[in-house]
C-alpha cells in the first residue's frame, strides 16, 4: 500500500483519531482530585493515589495527636472521697441512742472534784454540763443556775463557767452537810453549857415535831424528845436553856461498832484534798436496803441540800454524825431513834447520775474517812 493511496490515507486518519481519543481520555481522568477523597474512603484504585496518600497521614497525625482528652478522667474526685472516709474516726467517742448523743464516759473512773483550775472552767469540745459539774465537785443544777444556763444545758466551746466561789471552793459539794453540822454543833454547845443567857427583844421561836420541812440549817434541836416545844418569851429578861435528860445518843458515849450501811463495791473513795469526796460512794441496785451504821437519832431527812438528793443525817453522839445520800425512798423521819443495822432507806439515784449510796462520817463537824471506822470485808 502506497502512501498516497486513499486506503492508506483513511487508515492513517483512523489511527490518528484513536490516538487523539486515547489522549483525551487520559487528560480527563487526571483532572479531578480523586486521591484526596480516597484518603478518607480508603480507596486505592488510582495509580496516582499512592503519591497523594502521604500528605493526609501527616494531617491526620496532627489532628489525631490531641489525646489531651484522655487525662479528662478527672482525678480531682479522689481527694473528695478520702476526707469523707476519715470523718467517722472523729465521731467514734460519740454514740447515738434513740436520737440522743451519748458520751462514752465511765464516771466511776473519773475522780469527782478533780478539777484544780480555780473558780472558772473553759468549755472544751465534748464537754457536758454534768461532766463539768462532776470534775469540779458541783451539782449540775447549781452550776446551771450559777451560769444562767437553762435546759437542755447547751454549751459552747470556749465558754467560761463559774465553778466555784470567791475562794475557789465548789458551789455545793461538802459545804451543805458542813452547814448542817455547824447547826447541830451549835445546839450541842448550848446544851453542854447549861447556862442562862440574856434575851433581847425578839419574837417567840417555836420548834415542833412538824418542822421536818425546813432546811438543814433550821433543824430540830437534836437533844429534844420528839414533840417538845421550846419557847423564848419576849418579856422574860432571861431564859434558861437547861435541857431535859438527853438520851444516850446525845452523850459522848463511844460507839462500840460501826456497820456497813449497804452491800456493794466502793466506786469512789474518800478524798482529803480541797474539793475532794467527803465520804465514799457505794454502787448497788435501785431499792437495795440502806441501814444505820450505828445507834442514833435522825436529825435530818429531806432533799433540801442540792447535790445529795434524798438525804438522811443521823446523830450518834455529841461527836459523830453519819450521812446517807441519793436515797430512793426514806423510811425514817426526823427525831426518830434508830438502831444499828435498822433499815432507814432504799438505794436510788436522786441528785446524781447513777444508782449509788454516798456515805459520810463526820467527827466534830469534820469529814473523816469512813473506811477507818467500818470493818474490813
From Swiss-Prot:
**Where in this chain does the record put each LysM domain?**
119-163
Q: Where along the chain is composition biased (Polar residues)?
A: 79-93
Asked if the record carries the keyword Hydrolase, the reply is no
Q: What CDD domains does its record include?
A: LysM, M23_peptidase
InterPro entries for the chain: Cell_wall_metabolism_enzyme, Dup_hybrid_motif, LysM_dom, LysM_dom_sf, Peptidase_M23
Q: Where is this region: 4 X 7 AA approximate repeats?
A: 203-250
Identify the stretch annotated as signal peptide in this record.
1-25
What Gene Ontology terms for biological process does this UniProt record contain?
cell division
A cellular component term (GO) from this record?
Answer: cell outer membrane
Record's keyword terms, sorted:
Cell cycle, Cell division, Cell inner membrane, Cell membrane, Lipoprotein, Membrane, Palmitate, Repeat, Signal
Q: Which PROSITE patterns match?
A: LYSM (PS51782), PROKAR_LIPOPROTEIN (PS51257)
- Give lipid-anchored residues (N-palmitoyl cysteine): 26
Q: Where is the composition biased (Low complexity)?
A: 36-50, 62-77
What family does the Swiss-Prot or TrEMBL record give for this protein? Belongs to the E.coli NlpD/Haemophilus LppB family.
* Stated name of the protein: Murein hydrolase activator NlpD
Task: Give the species.
Answer: Salmonella typhimurium (strain LT2 / SGSC1412 / ATCC 700720)
Amino acid at each position: 500500500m502506497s502512501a498516497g493511496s486513499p486506503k492508506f490515507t483513511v487508515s492513517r486518519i483512523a489511527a490518528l483519531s484513536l490516538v487523539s481519543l486515547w489522549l483525551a481520555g487520559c487528560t480527563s481522568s487526571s483532572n479531578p482530585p480523586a486521591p484526596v477523597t480516597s484518603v478518607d474512603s480508603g480507596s486505592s484504585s488510582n495509580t496516582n493515589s499512592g503519591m497523594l496518600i502521604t500528605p493526609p497521614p501527616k494531617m491526620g497525625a496532627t489532628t489525631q495527636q490531641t489525646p489531651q482528652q484522655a487525662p479528662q478522667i478527672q482525678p480531682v474526685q479522689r481527694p473528695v472521697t478520702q476526707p469523707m472516709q476519715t470523718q467517722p474516726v472523729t465521731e467514734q467517742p460519740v454514740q447515738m441512742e434513740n436520737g440522743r448523743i451519748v458520751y462514752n464516759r465511765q464516771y466511776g473512773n473519773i475522780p469527782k472534784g478533780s478539777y484544780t483550775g480555780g473558780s472558772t472552767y473553759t468549755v472544751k469540745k465534748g464537754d457536758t454540763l454534768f461532766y463539768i459539774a462532776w470534775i469540779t465537785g458541783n451539782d449540775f443544777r447549781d452550776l446551771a443556775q450559777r451560769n444562767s444556763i437553762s435546759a437542755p444545758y447547751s454549751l459552747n466551746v470556749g465558754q467560761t463557767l463559774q465553778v466555784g466561789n470567791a475562794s475557789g471552793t465548789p458551789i455545793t459539794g461538802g459545804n451543805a452537810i458542813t452547814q448542817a453540822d455547824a447547826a447541830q454543833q451549835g445546839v450541842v454547845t448550848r446544851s453542854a453549857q447549861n447556862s442562862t443567857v440574856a434575851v433581847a427583844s425578839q419574837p417567840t421561836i417555836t420548834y415542833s415535831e412538824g418542822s421536818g420541812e425546813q432546811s438543814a440549817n433550821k433543824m430540830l434541836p437534836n437533844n429534844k424528845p420528839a414533840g417538845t416545844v421550846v419557847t423564848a418569851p419576849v418579856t422574860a429578861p432571861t431564859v434558861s436553856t437547861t435541857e431535859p435528860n438527853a438520851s444516850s445518843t446525845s452523850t459522848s458515849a463511844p460507839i462500840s461498832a460501826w456497820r456497813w450501811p449497804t452491800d456493794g463495791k466502793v466506786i469512789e473513795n474518800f478524798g482529803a484534798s480541797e474539793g475532794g469526796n467527803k465520804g465514799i460512794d457505794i454502787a448497788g441496785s435501785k431499792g437495795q436496803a440502806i441501814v444505820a451504821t450505828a445507834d442514833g437519832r435522825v436529825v435530818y431527812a429531806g432533799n433540801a441540800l442540792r447535790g445529795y438528793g434524798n438525804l438522811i443525817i443521823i446523830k450518834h453522839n455529841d461527836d459523830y454524825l453519819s450521812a446517807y445520800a441519793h436515797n430512793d425512798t426514806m423510811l425514817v423521819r426526823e427525831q426518830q431513834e434508830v438502831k444499828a443495822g435498822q433499815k432507814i432507806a432504799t438505794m436510788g439515784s436522786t441528785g446524781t447520775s447513777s444508782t449509788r449510796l454516798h456515805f459520810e462520817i463526820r467527827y466534830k463537824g469534820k469529814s473523816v474517812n469512813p473506811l477507818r471506822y467500818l470493818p474490813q470485808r
